Regions:
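Ligand-binding loop in jelly-roll beta-barrel domains
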Residues: 77, 85-90, 99, 109, ...
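Short, structured beta-strand/loop micro-motifs enriched in basic residues and often containing a Trp
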Residues: 140-148, 270-274
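An exposed, glycine/acidic-rich loop-and-rim segment of catalytic or binding clefts
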Residues: 143-150, 161-163, 169-220
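C-terminal amphipathic alpha-helical segment
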Residues: 189-254, 260
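Short beta-strand segments in beta-sandwich/barrel cores
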Residues: 254-256, 271-276, 289
Length: 315
């Protein structure tokens, strides 16, 4: 039994920057690198195992061929995706469909997601919901381009958390570094892209009708995270919903853990330490991402670290 440390793809974006390199030391393809798909089995960017007996396997292959590592799940598709996003400019104002709409129209799951704010510049903000009271008002404000009248802006700071269910109008603003936990989907409907053009002089495609089909009325409710503290561990349940549960762990010393989920997706956001599994010691550092599979029933971590950890739930 051993952890699965991962090597994962980068994605360049019109709104990306270089903080994936400056903050985490990752090799990036350009100064417009927007996303690191840190734990992914999605065909648009698959993680590879880089250690142990499964070194060289990609995650989708391992999930299909070795289901026992994941608790013999009912689903044939790895359900979650962990990303780090570096927003050097506004992302498009967008929305994601739910599972029913996504499967019918795009052939893949919808996307419910959540954001942990790793860092944010002073004055940074996101778009989180909208002000329209009816579908008719929503369509009218979009058609008129009355974005100030439509969009709900929310200031953010380091350590904030936001739950973004499917159907939520949203956008991430410049100066924000985010860890995103989401359903494994790459379907995005753009409502507004700030009229910008790519390096070829073209505006990016918008998806107004699809957006109107799936947008929710009203703003999402962002629950208050619950924290449990011991001497060496501060464990905060950021969200638990029908798709996933996400925790933030702040460790300051030696902590023993027992597996209470089929498997865990783990990301080290700061600090360093060691993890011991079956008498084997693994070094942990900022920027590491790994899976603790089903056969890892207990382990200990020693060090000063902040981590975000998640597991899937039955939808």
């Amino acid at each position: 039994m051993e952890p699965l440390f991962l090597d994962s793809p980068m994605h360049e974006k019109i709104w990306g920057g270089n903080r994936l390199k400056t903050e985490f030391g990752y090799d990036i393809p350009s100064e417009y690198t927007g996303e690191y798909w840190a734990i992914s089995a999605h065909p648009n960017g698959v993680s590879y195992v880089k250690n142990g007996k499964y070194a060289g396997f990609h995650l989708a292959e391992l999930y299909k061929d070795k289901p026992e590592l994941f608790g013999n799940p009912k689903t044939s598709v790895f359900p979650l995706l962990t990303k780090i996003l570096d927003a050097n400019d506004w992302l498009s104002v967008q929305v994601h469909p739910d599972d029913a709409y996504g499967l019918e129209h795009e052939g893949e799951l919808g996307k419910t997601e959540c954001w942990y704010i790793i860092d944010a510049e002073e004055g940074a903000e996101i778009i989180y919901g909208h002000k329209a009271q009816t579908k008719e008002e929503l369509a009218s404000l979009i058609e008129a381009g009355d974005w100030d009248g439509l969009l709900s802006r929310t200031p953010v700071k380091k350590g904030d958390f936001f739950f973004v269910p499917s159907g939520t109008m949203h956008a991430i603003g410049p100066g924000i570094l985010i860890l995103e936990t989401q359903q494994s989907s790459d379907t995005t409907y753009r409502v507004y892209d700030f009229d910008r053009r790519d390096d070829q002089g073209n505006k990016r495609e918008l998806h107004i009708q699809q957006s109107l089909d799936v947008l929710n009325l009203g703003n999402p409710e962002n629950s208050v995270p619950a924290t449990v503290k011991t001497l060496q561990l501060e464990s905060t349940c950021l969200t638990s919903n029908s798709f996933f549960t996400v925790y933030k762990w702040k460790l300051s010393g030696l902590v023993d853990f027992k597996q209470a989920a089929p498997y865990l997706l783990c990301s080290v956001l700061s600090g360093n330490g060691t993890m011991t599994i079956d008498s084997r010691i693994y070094c942990l550092k900022k920027g590491d991402h790994f899976i603790l599979p089903n056969d890892v029933t207990d382990w200990e971590i020693d060090g000063q670290l902040e981590m975000v950890v998640s597991h899937p739930n039955e939808a």
